[in-house]
Design a protein with these regions (language model features):
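Helix-to-loop junctions at the C-terminal end of transmembrane segments
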Residues: 33-48, 136-137
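Hydrophobic core of transmembrane alpha-helices in multi-pass small-molecule transporters
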Residues: 64-67, 71, 75-97, 101
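Symmetry-related core transmembrane helices of the 12-TM Major Facilitator Superfamily/SLC fold
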Residues: 144-161
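Glycine-rich segments within core transmembrane alpha-helices of 12-TM secondary carriers
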Residues: 30-32, 112-133
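Helix-loop boundary and gating motifs at the non-cytosolic
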Residues: 1-32
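Structural signature of the two symmetry-related core transmembrane helices
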Residues: 51-67, 149
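Flexible cytoplasmic inter-helical loops of multi-pass small-molecule transporters
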Residues: 109, 160-176
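Paired intracellular helix-loop junctions of major facilitator superfamily
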Residues: 102-113
Length: 176
């Protein structure tokens, strides 16, 4: 919702196309700079599991989009820029951790069809995008952060119930 409908939402909030492009670019660049440090931290034996890190990132993302929705009419351009930019950064930070969670689960011998999962994710994105388009056309662009809240809660529930255990033996063996 946040990336696919960034222009729709931000144009309605008074941003120019140039500002929207810069905001999304900066959000993605900040994420790209932070990803190696977070990945390095996640690989340490004493670090929380990828699942726990995803839950934490998702909670931060949820707070950001709730703040965005709650201040939709009252906030300044600066506040909207910071909230939307941070939301984009968090969203982009979570993607490699989702992939890592799947790959580590497979490596641990659990049955997981990654291709089917990716395909289902694409179909779900298409349906969610279509539905959000209909909602936005009917109720306005303020539906976008509300939809993002709903998707974040759904993602939080899915990750919370994902059966993952951090493989500390592998991490300790790599340390030696």
């Amino acid at each position: 919702a946040l990336m696919g409908y960034a222009s729709v939402y931000l144009l309605e909030k008074g941003f120019t196309n140039t500002q929207i492009g810069l905001l999304t670019a900066v959000g993605c660049i900040v994420s790209a700079v932070l990803q190696p440090a977070l990945a390095s931290y996640a690989d340490r034996p004493e670090s929380p599991s990828v699942r726990t890190m995803l839950l934490g990132a998702n909670l931060i993302q949820l707070v950001l989009v709730i703040s965005l929705a709650a201040t939709a009419e009252s906030s300044s351009m600066v506040v909207r820029t910071l909230l939307y930019g941070a939301s984009i950064t968090m969203l982009m930070l979570m993607i490699p951790f989702v992939n890592s969670l799947g790959m580590e689960t497979i490596r641990q011998g659990e049955e997981l069809d990654y291709g089917i999962g990716r395909g289902m994710g694409s179909v779900a994105y298409a349906i969610a995008s279509w539905l959000l388009g209909r909602l936005t056309a009917s109720f306005g662009a303020d539906m976008i952060p509300i939809w993002a809240i709903a998707l974040n809660i759904l993602f939080l529930i899915c990750v919370f119930h994902f059966p993952f255990k951090k493989d500390r033996k592998k991490a300790e063996a790599e340390k030696e």
